[in-house]
Amino acid sequence: VKQKTTNNAKIADHPILMATLYNYFAAEYQALCYQAYNVAKERTILLHKTFPKKKNMAIVLDIDETVLNNSPYQAKMIQINAHYDSCWNTWCRQADAKPVPGAVSFLKYADSLGFNIFYVSNRKEKAVK
């Protein structure tokens, strides 16, 4: 006899459930984000002081989960029992992702010091603009 899988069982088995819950509810998530960007800020200050006349310094970051938090997208994937590719482009076009804690202030500060900022992404070109 094959038992019918309930939606709750599918949700519990979804591969990104724990990571998504962590991003939503763990105090450590926000603290670690701020810590990472504070360390990055310290490094940019050090580089700027060490090489004050250098004009070509750059910061390169990935967009998703480094600058933008896609937890709402991940939660939706869990809720509808879907996986990454099925509606990623739709999510990107909606432009609903919020910044990762600390990202905006760090990037504004780095920009004010004259750092060139480059973003890496697997998003389609239309979704990045």
Residue ranges and their predicted role:
Residues 50, 56, 67-98, 105, ...:
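Active-site neighborhood of HAD-like aspartate-dependent phosphohydrolases
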